[in-house]
Curated annotation (Swiss-Prot):
Annotated signal sequence range: 1-31
MF (Gene Ontology): C-X-C chemokine binding
A GO CC annotation given for this chain: extracellular region
Location of the protein in the cell: Secreted
Domain of life: Eukaryota
Protein source organism: Ixodes ricinus
Name of the featured protein: Evasin P1134
Keyword entries, A-Z: Disulfide bond, Glycoprotein, Secreted, Signal
């Protein structure tokens, strides 16, 4: 009875330890500020009879042929490595400066009793005042 209890406790400790290690490794991988992206270029590549590979002329100039060791067919892929640790963390003023702003345009005036006003859909008085302001 004591042996079974001791074995059960050992198994429980090993499971808990395994979960803890898995969580720590996963968190460490997420903290890494490096990104490796792969994009399919929209075409495949094949090995020619002389041993060279067909050119990859896909979406961008960085497309290269990637294939398994003995395969005669491969995929044209574009790879990019970005190390975000080289960039500073943006401040609030940087984020505020990068926030998109609405364009300044003439907005249509809606009639509360029906569709837009006749003509261009703009109140002529507002347009006249804005044009005078611009001149």
């Amino acid at each position: 009875m004591e042996v079974k209890t001791f074995a059960f406790l050992q198994i429980a400790v090993f499971i808990a330890l395994g979960i803890q290690i898995f969580a720590a490794v996963t968190a460490a991988a997420d903290a890494n500020e490096e990104v490796f992206t792969v994009e399919y270029c929209g075409m495949n590549c094949t090995q020619k009879s002389d041993g060279t590979w067909t050119e990859c002329s896909g979406k961008n100039k960085d497309c290269r042929c990637y294939h398994e060791s003995d395969a005669r067919e491969g995929l044209c892929l574009s790879t990019e490595y970005t190390d975000f640790s080289q960039f500073e963390t943006p401040s609030n003023s940087d984020l505020e400066a990068a926030t998109p702003r609405p364009r300044k345009t003439l907005y249509p005036v809606r009639n509360p009793h029906g569709p837009k006003t006749r003509g261009l859909g703009y109140d002529k008085r507002i347009l006249r005042d804005r044009v005078k302001f611009l001149i």
